[in-house]
Regions:
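Walker A/P-loop
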Residues: 8-10, 51-52, 56-86
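Pre-Walker A (pre-P-loop) alpha-helix and adjacent loop at the N terminus of AAA/AAA+ ATPase modules
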Residues: 17-58
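Short conserved motifs of the RecA-like P-loop NTPase core
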Residues: 194-210, 265
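C-terminal helical "lid" of AAA+/P-loop NTPase domains
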Residues: 205-209, 216-230
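Conserved C-terminal helix/linker of AAA+ ATPases
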Residues: 229-250
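Conserved small/polar residues in nucleotide/adenosyl-binding loops
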Residues: 289-296
């Protein structure tokens, strides 16, 4: 079982190196290259200590999109000497969960190997689907890792939540997003290094601001921008502010006035203004203006002045 999984992972990585989106290819292979979330992944933190002691608990990763939830789950599985079974709550159901549980029981009986069940977007599973997981977390058949952008107390059933530690991930800082983008530009193996892209300082700032802490948004926009530019006579691809702004605006933004997206959009607008990024400010202002929030004639506070 472990050998087959290793072969699958090898083939997946080969494909990822050639065809997968940049954000997928740039997932860090180790904790040493993981950017941000040091309050969780730091060498002296609880999660790392549990890994070192081979006492990994079931836990839930709660945080905004692009903050590293899926990457962290994969990294945790590497040193845990366990079979890693990932599913998405969007595309999987009870039959998939029961199949994984059956394989976990077989691994446990025949190979004395643990199984990590990783459920991405656990909030998309209803109560009945979450109930299927519950007894197998209780008896230790699986170590459960869930990832969600929603408040766990509202979306995860209480019995399952009571058996899990909740780790809260933060949106990546502008410095962290900038580091990830720069790494992608120079990485010749999984990044864009072979394309010799040169990102103008203003373009990098715009990319970081509009990404608003989401590394996936930044990397996807970067990849779009780089491939939108033809190399010059020297083989260089010059990426200016206009190209980056265009790449960012091709993204369909998620905006929900009733949820956190409303406040995230206002936050991104304020950061763009304070960061002296007119293109970014106009982008987020237009998004606010064309939303239902405009009907409320809302105003935002910018350093003591309301607009």
């Amino acid at each position: 079982m472990a050998q087959a999984e290793s072969l699958f992972e090898h083939n997946r990585r080969q494909w990822a190196g050639k065809e997968a989106p940049l954000a997928e290819r740039m997932r860090p292979p180790s904790f040493d290259e993981f950017v941000g979330q040091q309050h969780i992944v730091g060498s002296e933190r609880v999660l790392r200590k549990a890994l070192e002691a081979d006492r990994l608990p079931s836990f839930i990763l709660w945080g905004p999109p692009g903050s590293g939830k899926t990457t962290l789950a994969r990294l945790v599985a590497q040193p845990a000497n366990a079979s890693f079974s990932p599913v998405s709550a969007v595309t999987s159901g009870v039959a998939d969960l029961r199949r994984i549980v059956g394989e976990a029981q077989e691994n446990q009986a025949m190979h004395q190997q643990k199984t990590i069940l990783f459920v991405d977007e656990i909030h998309r599973f209803n109560k009945s689907q979450q109930d299927v997981i519950l007894p197998h977390v209780y008896d230790g058949t699986v170590i459960f890792i869930g990832a969600t952008t929603e408040y766990p107390a509202f979306e995860v059933i209480s019995p399952l939540l009571s058996r899990c530690r909740v780790f809260t991930l933060e949106a990546l800082s502008p410095e962290h997003v900038g580091d990830i983008v720069r790494r992608a530009l120079v990485d010749h193996v999984t990044g864009l290094g072979k394309l010799h892209a040169d990102l103008a300082p203003g373009a990098l700032e715009q990319l970081v601001i509009v990404a608003n802490g989401d590394a996936r948004v930044a990397l996807n926009a970067l990849e779009t921008a780089v491939f939108a530019v033809e190399p010059d006579d020297c083989g260089q691809r010059k990426i200016d502010l206009g190209i980056v702004s265009d790449a960012l605006q091709r993204r369909s933004p998620m905006y929900a006035k009733a949820g956190e997206g409303h406040y995230d959009t206002i936050s991104a607008f304020i950061k763009s203004v304070r960061g002296s990024s007119p293109d970014g400010a106009l982008y987020w202002l237009c998004l606010l203006y064309t939303s239902d929030a405009a009907d409320e004639r809302s105003s935002v506070d910018l350093g003591g002045r309301r607009i």
